[in-house]
């Protein structure tokens, strides 16, 4: 029904965004990983590729940063026992390129590590994904990746993102500094922010 929605990104929450387009605010479920990255685009023009699920009482929108990721989502929800929430959880834990690698190497343990998927489900899903691998491989090869050093600009963006969530500059700087200690060189902002927020739950406040 909708290929994509383009408008102003007005709200970012854990696993969801709101895009205003022609006076209508579209609530769109996305991965938590991408939601963290979306914070930087608040109040800016934004495009998201969408998948709509129609139910008797509601229409649910799911969003993706690329058509390739959306196609992977559609492949996942075609499997018995995999609903949209679990499919998003899989893509959150195992982004498209990683998921393709997991399937190629038949890494059952990695797939079973996703919350909501046990070993038996992972084994069954792996068999089905292997059958779909010809569909996934072209997507994997088209996904652009970049390995960059953790630059000062990246750290500054992290501080700004935390500030947008209500953290003071001092708290944000401390959280980012602690997070990068646990990450390898070349980590991106998408890697840094989840660690920073996780550490916050262990005792860092917003002040």
From Swiss-Prot:
It is found in: Cytoplasm. Residues 145-150 are annotated as: Flexible linker. One of its GO terms (biological process) is DNA recombination. GO terms for cellular component: cytoplasm; Holliday junction helicase complex; Holliday junction resolvase complex. Keywords: Cytoplasm, DNA damage, DNA recombination, DNA repair, DNA-binding. CDD domains: UBA_RuvA_C. Transmembrane segments: none annotated. Residues 1-65 are annotated as: Domain I. GO terms for molecular function: ATP binding; four-way junction DNA binding; four-way junction helicase activity. It comes from the Bacteria. InterPro entries: DNA_helicase_Holl-junc_RuvA_I, Hlx-hairpin-Hlx_DNA-bd_motif, NA-bd_OB-fold, RuvA, RuvA_2-like, RuvA_C, RuvA_C_sf. HAMAP family: DNA_HJ_migration_RuvA. Has three domains with a flexible linker between the domains II and III and assumes an 'L' shape. Domain III is highly mobile and contacts RuvB. The RuvA-RuvB-RuvC complex processes Holliday junction (HJ) DNA during genetic recombination and DNA repair, while the RuvA-RuvB complex plays an important role in the rescue of blocked DNA replication forks via replication fork reversal (RFR). RuvA specifically binds to HJ cruciform DNA, conferring on it an open structure. The RuvB hexamer acts as an ATP-dependent pump, pulling dsDNA into and through the RuvAB complex. HJ branch migration allows RuvC to scan DNA until it finds its consensus sequence, where it cleaves and resolves the cruciform DNA. NCBIfam families: ruvA. This is Holliday junction branch migration complex subunit RuvA. It comes from Chlamydia pneumoniae.
């Amino acid at each position: 029904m909708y290929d994509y929605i383009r408008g102003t990104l007005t709200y970012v929450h854990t696993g969801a965004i709101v895009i205003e387009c022609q006076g209508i605010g579209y609530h769109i479920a996305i991965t938590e990983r991408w939601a963290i990255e979306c914070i930087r685009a608040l109040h800016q023009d934004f495009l998201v590729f969408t998948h709509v699920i129609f139910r008797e009482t509601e229409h649910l929108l799911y969003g993706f940063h690329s058509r390739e990721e959306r196609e992977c989502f559609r492949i996942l929800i075609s499997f018995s026992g995999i609903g949209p929430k679990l499919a998003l959880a899989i893509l959150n834990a195992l982004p498209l390129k990683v998921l393709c690698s997991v399937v190629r190497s038949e890494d059952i343990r990695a797939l079973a590590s996703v919350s909501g998927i046990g070993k038996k489900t992972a084994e069954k899903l792996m068999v089905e994904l292997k059958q779909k691998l010809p569909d996934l491989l072209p997507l994997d090869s088209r996904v652009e990746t970049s390995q960059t050093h953790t630059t000062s600009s990246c750290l500054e963006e992290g501080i700004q993102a935390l500030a947008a969530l209500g953290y003071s500059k001092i708290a944000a700087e401390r959280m980012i500094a602690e997070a990068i200690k646990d990450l390898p060189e070349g980590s991106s902002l998408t890697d840094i922010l989840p660690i920073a927020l996780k550490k916050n739950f262990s005792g860092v406040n917003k002040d």
